[in-house]
Amino acid sequence: MVALRGLGSGLQPWCPLDLRLEWVDTVWELDFTETEPLDPSIEAEIIETGLAAFTKLYESLLPFATGEHGSMESIWTFFIENNVSHSTLVALFYHFVQIVHKKNVSVQYREYGLHAAGLYFLLLEVPGSVANQVFHPVMFDKCIQTLKKSWPQESNLNRKRKKEQPKSSQANPGRHRKRGKPPRREDIEMDEIIEEQEDENICFSARDLSQIRNAIFHLLKNFLRLLPKFSLKEKPQCVQNCIEVFVSLTNFEPVLHECHVTQARALNQAKYIPELAYYGLYLLCSPIHGEGDKVISCVFHQMLSVILMLEVGEGSHRAPLAVTSQVINCRNQAVQFISALVDELKESIFPVVRILLQHICAKVVDKSEYRTFAAQSLVQLLSKLPCGEYAMFIAWLYKYSRSSKIPHRVFTLDVVLALLELPEREVDNTLSLEHQKFLKHKFLVQEIMFDRCLDKAPTVRSKALSSFAHCLELTVTSASESILELLINSPTFSVIESHPGTLLRNSSAFSYQRQTSNRSEPSGEINIDSSGETVGSGERCVMAMLRRRIRDEKTNVRKSALQVLVSILKHCDVSGMKEDLWILQDQCRDPAVSVRKQALQSLTELLMAQPRCVQIQKAWLRGVVPVVMDCESTVQEKALEFLDQLLLQNIRHHSHFHSGDDSQVLAWALLTLLTTESQELSRYLNKAFHIWSKKEKFSPTFINNVISHTGTEHSAPAWMLLSKIAGSSPRLDYSRIIQSWEKISSQQNPNSNTLGHILCVIGHIAKHLPKSTRDKVTDAVKCKLNGFQWSLEVISSAVDALQRLCRASAETPAEEQELLTQVCGDVLSTCEHRLSNIVLKENGTGNMDEDLLVKYIFTLGDIAQLCPARVEKRIFLLIQSVLASSADADHSPSSQGSSEAPASQPPPQVRGSVMPSVIRAHAIITLGKLCLQHEDLAKKSIPALVRELEVCEDVAVRNNVIIVMCDLCIRYTIMVDKYIPNISMCLKDSDPFIRKQTLILLTNLLQEEFVKWKGSLFFRFVSTLIDSHPDIASFGEFCLAHLLLKRNPVMFFQHFIECIFHFNNYEKHEKYNKFPQSEREKRLFSLKGKSNKERRMKIYKFLLEHFTDEQRFNITSKICLSILACFADGILPLDLDASELLSDTFEVLSSKEIKLLAMRSKPDKDLLMEEDDMALANVVMQEAQKKLISQVQKRNFIENIIPIIISLKTVLEKNKIPALRELMHYLREVMQDYRDELKDFFAVDKQLASELEYDMKKYQEQLVQEQELAKHADVAGTAGGAEVAPVAQVALCLETVPVPAGQENPAMSPAVSQPCTPRASAGHVAVSSPTPETGPLQRLLPKARPMSLSTIAILNSVKKAVESKSRHRSRSLGVLPFTLNSGSPEKTCSQVSSYSLEQESNGEIEHVTKRAISTPEKSISDVTFGAGVSYIGTPRTPSSAKEKIEGRSQGNDILCLSLPDKPPPQPQQWNVRSPARNKDTPACSRRSLRKTPLKTAN
């Protein structure tokens, strides 16, 4: 009774006397949707005491809900007895709950709504509520939604606004009136705008937010107390709403401790709303709320957004959340919750978990960070599944990895990486063998990751390769046995690919057999590599795959492939993998900056992993050191960083050196290699040390550390290092250096390298030495030079040191030169004297020492540069005498024009002696040094050097002549300029070394502009692109595209037209190809003829590839005006030479390289994986640009180019020029690209349009015929000796070409001397050589008349048709050249229609009655011999094959036979007339259609 009395007191505010029952009934009738608001006075009465009315009623109802009052007291009886309607209570609760769902609600009303919802839940908790119909699904859902709606939105929390008293929710009573129809969208949007404006005045303090949060917490706790008691099994929509609200609350606030949501605990132990939310989700999963796994499926579906870090809410599209620590924690809690459910529910939940995992894969955000977290979540959940379920999912993942969607294939790799970080599962023997393989890491690497390395999408290939590299790194830390076995230890499979110098281990790291799961499955997935390799069968080789990927067109793929390669090499013995080391060092010069950086990084990592491997040390030096000259500063800095890290930073004092320190040992090993096998890298090191010296990198401590090694086993590298840094660091221990000099110079056979470095150091410190010491060293050096005891390398260093010593001893330049003349004059005199004894005395060469003579000549050249005043003519004569050869008289100067012949003659005194080539080679260098100082000598010597270049057979001599000539070109530019053609001829030298040397030297001269692009030089230079040596061709491409083109961007464009004339050796144009050339030049550089067409096209395409779009646009117009128009207008004659030229021209115009980049490039959608707004904007810009350019290009093409093409076509047809074939091919492409524009263009001349359409149809038929003949070329003849011998392979041509004069027998022409192809033999008909069996054939096919393609085709088709029906053939059977004519009466039998060919291709040739060949068929009405008579059996207009056959069957056949004793009629010119044109109408001039071009270039 106490409880009932308290209930009555609590109900007092909720039972107003003036409450209209109609309002309550309306609320229930409208299902708690919209109704008129509550009377304000009644609302004021309830909330008069604030929350007291809510809390007092709650306290009164609670004992009845919890059962504390006992079983005797019933609340429902009390309601009836006291005339209290529970419907009224629910309606009043609804009023306050509904207010919360509005936007402009104050803190107080939010609290009222939350408490009202709590009262409704409490009333539902009271036993008997269902029977008394307290529950209403809409009211229930609105109370649940209050948990979300009552909390202010983020926009409200973040606004800064003035705090004002919030407006009453009753401000607009009429707004919630029932509406008869749905509101219009405009009204809703206006309402939202008004509400937002009203909402501007609301502000929430921290205290306000705390009150709202506490109210939500208590309401949620009350609701969770209801859930175990109140079944929602029959209320699926309510369950769904509960799940959505609970999931949204999991992200309500951070949970500062680990949340155990499934533990049985009292609700009052929970402290955070997310804890309660997860507990609510757990309660919903109990059987009381639904059977089976329906509820769990709904829960997981909502949890998916939390796991994928997406916004939680309604709608299919959910934006990704910013990746913050709170979002990550929420994801972790969601995964923990699902894991706990799996642990508890076991098998019953496995199917739902598998669906969840698949949905994670399908809906993950395609951004790197989101994919990584999603993969981690997936793997954590997957680890909870038993082996059977795990294997089933991996099987599904394998199929998912072959999805057609790129993001799916990328995410698979993230999942595989995460799986590989876990320990491998033990084999479950209960599984089938088919499923056991899915448990192994080997399957993940082999079947999924490796396959994606061959994916057709570059982003997937790159991701797979980087994953592969990461996988290899995992083997070091986690020691995964399966991966180690896969990459290192498995000896079970054989090597499938080997390369010279490469040892591929017999391990699955390099070759392994694919385990196919089900070959009968349809392969609809993406499984084709970009290189065309089919993925999915056969053996695979990791190293072979990597080599392909390192050459991939995409930068990121190459970069990732390098990472994988280095990861493998780190764990391998590289002794047999030289090719892979070469690949690594070559990638340091990749075109892409990021790849070069990665290659530097990878090589350094490999060297650090195996610091004592000499091969890796050499590869590192060859790869890293040259990059200090890189044009990209960031790459150069990276190379300098690695050099500093490995070379300089590890140099300690010798007393601190010990062999166990890998870093110190490595540093000195690298320096030693730089002084021995890798000396050629010294020039790059000079650049590095120059940069370091500017940064004051070399401290006194560092220098002393280096000096401490000079007397040790590291002496040579230490002196090399000192020679590099001495110039920038004068503070050296001079006494130590002089002591070392005295010690080593007194040795009989000192180390040349070390001695040279010491002399270099002495030269740098000369100005700091005492005068006495300096003079002493000077005398010693001079003495050694006079003694000729040192090697050539030391002589150069000694001369340099001598110059520096004299400079240090002198105070003025004049004094320095005087001192040099005095010191060096003695050495010069000694050289002169020794040479005179050998060269000028009789029998002087008989007992000469070649090595000494070389030293005399070499020393003379170096010393003479320091004292030019002491060099006399006698010395010139001596060097010229050494160069003279007795064979000179046998050679005549090459014809270079009359003006150059005298200059090529050597002076008379340079004849008569014979010297070995090594001496003559050194003499050339010395002569060049002398010429640099003496211009008169240069004038006399240059012609002789040029002649030596042409007649000398020794490679060393020719090489040195080129070097000298190019040096003299810098000193005497004008003098040498006229001999540049002679130098450029060396680009076709027989020796590859000379060709490459010439290429390098000419490139240097062109870069510095000592040589200009004039005459034949450009064409000589580009001919290196087709050099037989691939390295030279590649280097030529580099020089042209990356060095010379950058200095002169229009160079290729300016020379392109002349290239076409020049390489076809066409000299009839008044402007092009008019520079002088000797016959030898023409012979060496000739690319004329069909056999060289492919090489010419390679040059053209290379030039076009490096055009800008503007240049491509202009070159098309320029080609038409400068080449095609000249032939169309009759300015240039149309002959066979012109045919080759035009053939090249049309092939150029048809090539893809001449198409604008903006037109042929497609946006690389593979690169737009991560929703990059900037990338999408660029794609839109590209499309707009492409559309604009297309319009301009089409206009230019239609107005300026098409008229020329049409006019030229007519001329080619008239003259029967073979290039018509290429023109038709080009025209076909044009008609495909500009179909609509051409229709507009030909609208004014329908006759011309009809003719062109007819010609294109005929050309298409010819192409079909060619394909047919190519297929049946081997069955053209018949079997048996008595039958006709087969006609030789028929050249597939568009036209008949007369045999050139003097070529009587076409069988002996070059076109027939080898098997013909359509490309190689166009324009000729090849007939087999005469044999006894071909008598009739020879009579019917005269030698001087090759047949056209159509004639041959008809002969073959008719012959096969007759033979197919004839069993008994006469031995005199011949191939009869008869035709079924379909032309006008004026046409002769040589003019052929495609009638019989069309019949043959359709299989519709009519059968002929058996008869002798000489007997006319009974239906033939006339037989004629050899006359130009034809029987018209086909329509006058082009028609289908069926119509032609019908016309054919209605008439009688005519058989036209050539009279054996009468010569055949001469072939008429082939001219296809349009059916739409009258035969008497003269051909109109198409040139009148051509307009002035939009723009032409020079």
Swiss-Prot record:
GO cellular component: condensed chromosome, centromeric region; condensed nuclear chromosome; condensin complex; membrane; nucleoplasm; pericentric heterochromatin
Keyword Repeat: yes
Residues recorded as bearing Phosphoserine in the entry: 567, 1329, 1348, 1357, 1372, 1382, 1384
Entry keywords, A to Z: Cell cycle, Cell division, Coiled coil, Disease variant, DNA condensation, Mitosis, Nucleus, Phosphoprotein, Primary microcephaly, Repeat
Localization: Nucleus
HEAT repeats: 441-475, 537-572, 579-610, 973-1009
Positions of the UniProt region annotated as Disordered: 155-188, 514-533, 889-911, 1306-1339, 1429-1498
Coiled-coil spans in chain: 1219-1275
InterPro entries in the cross-refs: ARM-like (IPR011989), ARM-type_fold (IPR016024), CND1/NCAPD3 (IPR026971), Cnd1_C (IPR032682), NCAPD3 (IPR012371)
Chain's role: Regulatory subunit of the condensin-2 complex, a complex which establishes mitotic chromosome architecture and is involved in physical rigidity of the chromatid axis. May promote the resolution of double-strand DNA catenanes (intertwines) between sister chromatids. Condensin-mediated compaction likely increases tension in catenated sister chromatids, providing directionality for type II topoisomerase-mediated strand exchanges toward chromatid decatenation. Specifically required for decatenation of centromeric ultrafine DNA bridges during anaphase.
Quaternary state and interactors: Component of the condensin-2 complex, which contains the SMC2 and SMC4 heterodimer, and 3 non SMC subunits that probably regulate the complex: NCAPH2, NCAPD3 and NCAPG2. Interacts with BRD4 (isoform B), leading to insulate chromatin from DNA damage response pathway.
Disease: Microcephaly 22, primary, autosomal recessive: A form of microcephaly, a disease defined as a head circumference more than 3 standard deviations below the age, sex and ethnically matched mean. Brain weight is markedly reduced and the cerebral cortex is disproportionately small.
Stated name of the protein: Condensin-2 complex subunit D3
